[in-house]
Amino acid sequence: MSHNDTIVAQATPPGRGGVGILRVSGQQARNVAQAVLGKLPKARYADYLPFKDADGTALDQGIALWFPGPNSFTGEDVLELQGHGGPVILDLLLKRILTLPGVRIARPGEFSERAFLNDKLDLAQAEAIADLIDASSEQAARSALNSLQGAFSARVNHLVEALTHLRIFVEAAIDFPDEEIDFLSDGKIEAQLNEVIGDLDAVRAEARQGSLLREGMKVVIAGRPNAGKSSLLNALAGREAAIVTDIAGTTRDVLREHIHIDGMPLHIIDTAGLREASDEVERIGIERAWQEIEQADRVLFMVDGTTTDATDPAQIWPDFIARLPAKLPITVVRNKADVTGEQPGISEVNGHSLIRLSARTNEGVDVLRNHLKQSMGFDTSMEGGFLARRRHLQALEDAANHLQQGKAQLLGAWAGELLAEELRLAQQALSEITGEFTSDDLLGRIFSSFCIGK
């Protein structure tokens, strides 16, 4: 589809509501205004007008806003029609606009894509629009807004500028070897490189926090039947999300709850008790439990404290531990402290965290919440942060690796060309974040995940 087309879409959610908004962007937006409104509204003023059909009859009446390009969200001529939010009314108005020449329905994210292509937003800011809409906590929303306002991009652009400055010195030393310009003898290049590496590490740490706010952590509760897994899910969720009975195998399928701990999203997953299945339904539930375990960020190994005194997971259930992915973090949760008389709390056993609690009485559950927050390295004291996506983290990691390779060249045999190339690759990786260096395929994947009308 051409970016020269004029596009239209509903900007408000589908369904019944008090207000419904249609957004038009492109060269034909002026003609749409003339056809539907009978005139072109004054730029950037709210005008209360009837919205007319082709025969001149009114379809609706509401507020029209006219934003001539390039001073608009997309950088093109933009018309917004704010009418009543009934789906029939909006559908009639949308059909009316689509009868006009050169107008088509917008693809998901196409308004934001045009804003990016017309330099109204960089790619990180455009992604922040979707993240702001999808934010699941106040802290995530604030961080997404910071990204939309350019906080993340400013940090990245500062790094890119520093690398540009560094590359000038390095490439000058390569291009003019006879000019007696020795940038290495006084250690200035090494000092500048170390400064860039330090700044990049700080951005990476903040980006990891932003990624936690956006992606959250997937925690799977696993163990034998009747260990209290569903009771723990209910305790963490603060509601009766799962059925709890004394009957082994009550939970047959995967149950999911999304909670927040100090703004950090947690995806808590309760699974079927692991044992030899008694029927086909239970077998499928246990198979799904293992699928969730293999994709988890952390496993809470639930143990009924009344059945064993062991605290080492390898002693409690060797076969279970042997089947777990090698690098998967495990937290042993000894449940039913209210029955065993154990003191709720946390300790370390053979490299694993051990938490004693009672899911039934909630004793020790706060200890588990704090443990989950700390295990992900989430720092609530970081103010004014930004949200980051997986691709951002990968780009930052790639840049860091190239800088370390460049430093090795600098401190080793002084292979100037190789150092310059590593600096160029680091700069290219950072530029992918803001979209200065980005493939069309990546752009398509990013914007296709947006809402229609955004």
Swiss-Prot record:
GO terms for cellular component: cytosol. GTP binds at residues 226-231, 245-251, 270-273, 335-338, 358-360. Binds 1 potassium ion per subunit. Mg(2+) binds at S230, T251. The keyword Magnesium applies. GO terms for molecular function: GTP binding; GTPase activity; metal ion binding. Keywords: Cytoplasm, GTP-binding, Hydrolase, Magnesium, Metal-binding, Nucleotide-binding, Potassium, tRNA processing. InterPro entries: G_TrmE (IPR031168), GTP-bd (IPR006073), GTP-bd_TrmE_N (IPR018948), GTPase_MnmE (IPR004520), MnmE_dom2 (IPR027368), MnmE_helical (IPR025867), P-loop_NTPase (IPR027417), Small_GTP-bd (IPR005225). Residues 216-377 form the TrmE-type G domain. (6S)-5-formyl-5,6,7,8-tetrahydrofolate binds at R23, E80, K120, K454. Its EC number is 3.6.-.-. Pfam families: MMR_HSR1 (PF01926), MnmE_helical (PF12631), TrmE_N (PF10396). K(+) binds at N226, T245, I247, T250. Its cofactor is K(+). It is found in: Cytoplasm. PROSITE patterns: G_TRME. GO terms for biological process: tRNA methylation; tRNA wobble uridine modification. It comes from the Bacteria. Belongs to the TRAFAC class TrmE-Era-EngA-EngB-Septin-like GTPase superfamily. TrmE GTPase family. Exhibits a very high intrinsic GTPase hydrolysis rate. Involved in the addition of a carboxymethylaminomethyl (cmnm) group at the wobble position (U34) of certain tRNAs, forming tRNA-cmnm(5)s(2)U34. Homodimer. Heterotetramer of two MnmE and two MnmG subunits. This is tRNA modification GTPase MnmE. It comes from Cronobacter sakazakii (strain ATCC BAA-894).
